[in-house]
Amino acid sequence: MKDTLFNQSLNKRFCFDEKVAHVFDDMLERSIPYYHEMLDLGAYFIAQNLKENINPKPLIYDLGCSTGNFFIALNQQIQQDIELVGIDNSMPMLKKAQEKLKDFNNARFECMDFLEVEFKEASAFSLLFVLQFVRPMQREVLLKKIYNSLALNGVLLVGEKIMSEDRILDKQMIELYYLYKQNQGYSHNEIAFKREALENVLVPYSLKENVALLESVGFKHVEALFKWVNFTLLVARKT
């Protein structure tokens, strides 16, 4: 279903409710440059890591899993038996995910606040365009929990919208991103109304800040797998 949510101002903060869930896949594809390419790239690196670290049934968490797109990408890349656990606090999103993955018997979904979850030891975690919605004071706490729950040589994927630490460059990056959205069919009003709804809800860090945050919780190896203007995909490995 096409995303037309912001044809007019919602007069409220952005939230992942039923209206958003209905159009979320279209919103992702038209709002995140190279979205599916980043999912495939992340799935590839997890698959390669699993090949090099033998586990009879590895556990993979997707936090803020929304409609389950990353699990589809993982199932296309990974041939071995895996356990996939998607956690999201939006039941409308999870209903979409369950519907899309009904033919896979290796995925289950839990409607919870992932900040409150006690994770089992896992081979991989993913936070794909999710950390930016976590309150800044809670990001380090969440990442430390993930680090402590990762098996040795396990990996964490972090996809984020980012900002530049230089005011002029940041303005130019945002302008280019808005041009991208216009080319995807969003009007000036839709872009402005969504920006208004996301204010103080989506709080981006710079690439340097995100890397420093991952290093502060214990990750010694953090790499940017992909970057387009103000979007990036990072991988961090526990050693």
UniProtKB/Swiss-Prot annotation:
<dbReference type="GO" id="GO:1904047">
    <property type="term" value="F:S-adenosyl-L-methionine binding"/>
</dbReference>
<dbReference type="Pfam" id="PF13649">
    <property type="entry name" value="Methyltransf_25"/>
</dbReference>
<comment type="similarity">
    <text>Belongs to the class I-like SAM-binding methyltransferase superfamily. Cx-SAM synthase family.</text>
</comment>
<feature type="binding site">
    <location>
        <position position="195"/>
    </location>
    <ligand>
        <name>S-adenosyl-L-methionine</name>
    </ligand>
</feature>
<dbReference type="InterPro" id="IPR005271">
    <property type="entry name" value="CmoA"/>
</dbReference>
<protein>
    <recommendedName>
        <fullName>Carboxy-S-adenosyl-L-methionine synthase</fullName>
        <ecNumber>2.1.3.-</ecNumber>
    </recommendedName>
</protein>
<dbReference type="GO" id="GO:0016743">
    <property type="term" value="F:carboxyl- or carbamoyltransferase activity"/>
</dbReference>
<dbReference type="InterPro" id="IPR041698">
    <property type="entry name" value="Methyltransf_25"/>
</dbReference>
<dbReference type="GO" id="GO:0002098">
    <property type="term" value="P:tRNA wobble uridine modification"/>
</dbReference>
<feature type="binding site">
    <location>
        <position position="35"/>
    </location>
    <ligand>
        <name>S-adenosyl-L-methionine</name>
    </ligand>
</feature>
<feature type="binding site">
    <location>
        <begin position="88"/>
        <end position="89"/>
    </location>
    <ligand>
        <name>S-adenosyl-L-methionine</name>
    </ligand>
</feature>
<comment type="subunit">
    <text>Homodimer.</text>
</comment>
<keyword id="KW-0949">S-adenosyl-L-methionine</keyword>
<keyword id="KW-0808">Transferase</keyword>
<dbReference type="InterPro" id="IPR029063">
    <property type="entry name" value="SAM-dependent_MTases_sf"/>
</dbReference>
<feature type="binding site">
    <location>
        <begin position="64"/>
        <end position="66"/>
    </location>
    <ligand>
        <name>S-adenosyl-L-methionine</name>
    </ligand>
</feature>
<comment type="function">
    <text>Catalyzes the conversion of S-adenosyl-L-methionine (SAM) to carboxy-S-adenosyl-L-methionine (Cx-SAM).</text>
</comment>
